Swiss-Prot record:
Record's keyword terms, sorted: Copper, Glycoprotein, Metal-binding, Oxidoreductase, Repeat, Signal
Enzyme class, first EC level, given as a word: oxidoreductase
Annotated glycosylation sites: 51, 237, 323, 355, 362, 405, 411, 422, 441, 458, 574
Induction field: The cluster is expressed in rice fermentation medium. Three regulators are located in the cluster (ptaR1, ptaR2 and ptaR3), suggesting that the production of pestheic acid is controlled by a complex regulatory mechanism.
InterPro entries: Cu-oxidase-like_N, Cu-oxidase_2nd, Cu-oxidase_C, Cu-oxidase_fam, Cupredoxin
Domain Plastocyanin-like: 71-184, 195-355, 431-551
Similarity comment: family membership: Belongs to the multicopper oxidase family.
Name used for this protein in its record: Oxydoreductase ptaK
Function: Oxydoreductase; part of the gene cluster that mediates the biosynthesis of pestheic acid, a diphenyl ether which is a biosynthetic precursor of the unique chloropupukeananes. The biosynthesis initiates from condensation of acetate and malonate units catalyzed by the non-reducing PKS ptaA. As the ptaA protein is TE/CLC domain-deficient, hydrolysis and Claisen cyclization of the polyketide could be catalyzed by ptaB containing a beta-lactamase domain.
Keyword Ribosomal protein applies: no
Species whose genome carries this gene: Pestalotiopsis fici (strain W106-1 / CGMCC3.15140)
């Protein structure tokens, strides 16, 4: 059984009579005829293997995978409570994008909203196409209402990822979907169950969450989510509605369902695509063999549960019981503070053996004791427990080091904001940093709130982040799979974990009261966001731009359509006031 999503717009509180499924996921790669795939060597990427080829240097296949997305407002009831949402092609989660390593992905985005938008392709490196990264005010202007923009970029890494809006906190309302890039096989398996997307759920629109965060009560943190979802589904007890809340609601909404074949090995692609919460994931009675973190294949290791911050992914193999019968429970749980604002509802899904079909089947399986015991632990395994499959050494002595102190403080009007070295971020949608840099403008003394760190032509960069604020934070860097050199509490002592082959990720956890040290080779000229992936935190200023090799950015021939997108946006803002309540991202 493939991953399930809610589809269509609901004019009344009903669930769709048919829940559409993501297409069957092939075990190896997608087949095409124009041009012919696979190549004579047997794979779309030729004779390369996971052992002998750099995972960020694909063979270009010449195949274009085209998609057409319409983004519009709607209403759905993911857990039985009807809510306003923003949807991609009337689906939640949005459509699956699927490609082979080295294919070109092309997505035309039509903005049918009454506000701007832009889509970001999480963890794609965008080498030589940084203007396709999809971050308004940084790599492009927002797509104006009624306008469209076509993103074209190479599937330059392989594994599991996702796309989402990067305009304000829109994606928390539903503008997101999974991406699968087929690449080198590492660990064999028999069946691919596809994406399993974990997300916290707010019953109110994202704008209401932001208004609460920035209102006169000077909230330090957002209100906790109302529920938690697996592939867009869970149930909710409608008797918990606030007094006077007349929103249509029905308890016992259907859960997501999956099916295991006895004795077979199944690949599960787990993604945390929520707005805020760290997720604990497990499957009762079945251990998880981890084979990839983010877009990085790793030497396989076995666990009973996973811990994923927002933006993080893990590919795992589950071997079904040889004589398995009945139904088991899949669990996604939001841990309490300091990991997240606690919520009193876990997400569950049903995993069947045999021919069980009832959506409301009860599972009698029990959670792993280790899963229960670890609910108060915010981070996953220590970095020394994870070994990338393909070894890449960290820069021996990075050319430059930047220390960033993260704090939480009130601004002049009393609102709590995050500060990066005493500067809270705010974007200017009308003047994308990448386009300014392309014109030779790399200094912004009149706009310190842009938080641009110009690293010049340095060939390697180390960033040391200290968390003097609240909570553990999932830190995401665009344009790179960075080396996680060290993570810990207190002050960094200068030690680098496994410098010959450190953990590589695009999103890693910065602990409360601690530090995270990352480094990367500066081989990708661009304006790359570095930010907390909690939607409400980046909305509150937890963000900087890494300006990498601006001398080479000036040499880019940026397509004219990027400029036209700005002209369309400027035309829209000439007669419409943009209510930028937050940082803009």
């Amino acid at each position: 059984m493939k991953s399930l999503f809610l589809t269509g717009l609901l004019s009344a509180l009903t669930w769709a009579s048919e829940f559409a499924s993501y297409p069957d996921i092939p075990l190896d790669y997608l087949y095409t005829t124009e041009p012919v795939t696979p190549l004579p060597q047997g794979y779309p990427w030729g004779s390369k293997t996971a052992n002998d080829s750099h995972p960020e240097e694909p063979t270009l296949t010449g195949v274009i995978r085209s998609y057409d997305f319409h983004i519009k407002a709607g209403q759905i009831a993911p857990d039985g409570y009807l809510k306003d949402v923003l949807l991609v092609n009337d689906q939640y989660p949005g459509p699956l994008i699927e490609a082979n390593w080295g294919d070109t992905i092309q997505v035309t985005v039509h903005n049918d909203l009454e506000e701007g938008t832009a889509l970001h392709w999480h963890a794609f490196l965008q080498k030589e196409t940084p203007w396709q990264d999809g971050v308004p005010g940084i790599t492009q202007c927002p797509i104006a209402p009624g306008a469209c923009f076509t993103y074209t970029f190479v599937a330059d890494s392989y594994g599991t990822s996702w796309y989402h809006s990067h305009y304000s906190a829109q994606y928390a309302d539903g503008i997101l979907g999974p991406i699968i890039v087929h690449g080198h096989p590492t660990v064999p398996y028999d069946i691919d169950l596809g994406p399993i997307m974990l997300s916290d759920l707010y019953h109110v629109p994202y704008t209401t969450v932001l208004e609460h965060l920035f209102d006169e009560d000077f909230a330090v943190v957002t209100k906790p989510a109302n529920n938690n979802l697996i592939n867009g589904r869970n149930s909710w007890n409608c008797t918990l509605k606030d007094l006077g809340d007349d929103t249509p609601c029905q308890s016992n909404a259907p859960l997501s369902e999956f099916r295991l074949t006895p004795g077979k090995k199944h690949r599960l692609r787990i993604l945390n695509v929520g707005g805020s919460a760290i997720q604990k994931f497990s499957l009762d009675g079945h251990k998880l063999q981890v084979i990839a973190h983010d877009f990085v294949p790793v030497l396989p290791y076995e666990v009973e549960f996973l811990t994923l911050g927002v933006g993080q992914r893990a590919d795992v193999i589950v071997e079904a019981l040889a004589n398995g019968t009945g139904t088991y429970t899949m669990r996604a749980t939001i841990p309490p503070a300091p990991c997240a604002n606690s919520v009193d509802h876990d997400a569950t899904a049903l995993v069947h053996y045999g021919n069980t079909t009832s959506t409301f089947s009860n599972s009698s399986s029990e959670a792993w004791p280790s899963f229960i015991e670890a609910l108060g632990v915010c981070d996953g395994l220590p970095t020394e427990e994870i070994t990338p499959w393909y070894a890449i050494p960290a820069p021996e002595a990075p050319a430059t080091t930047q220390i960033i102190n993260v704090t939480l403080a009130q601004n002049e009007t009393g609102q709590y904001l995050f500060y990066m070295d005493n500067s809270s971020f705010r974007v200017n949608y009308n003047h994308p940093v990448l386009l300014l840099s392309n014109l030779g403008n790399n200094s912004y003394p009149d706009d310190p709130e842009w938080n641009v760190y110009n690293f010049g032509s340095n060939n390697s960069i180390r960033i040391v982040m200290y968390n003097n604020a609240i909570r553990t934070h999932p830190i995401h860097l665009h344009g790179h799979n960075f080396f996680v050199e060290a993570v810990g509490l207190g002050e960094w002592d200068g030690h680098v974990d496994h410098p010959e082959n450190p953990v590589r990720r695009d999103t890693a956890m910065l602990p409360q009261g601690g530090y995270m040290v990352i480094s990367f080779n500066a081989d990708n000229p661009g304006a790359w966001p570095l930010h907390c992936h909690v939607a409400w935190h980046v909305s509150s200023g937890f963000y900087v731009t890494v300006l990498e090799r601006p001398d080479e950015i000036a040499e880019y021939k940026i397509p004219s359509v990027v400029g036209q997108t700005c002209r369309d946006w400027w035309g829209y803002t000439n007669h419409t006031i943009v209510n930028q309540i937050d940082s803009g991202l």
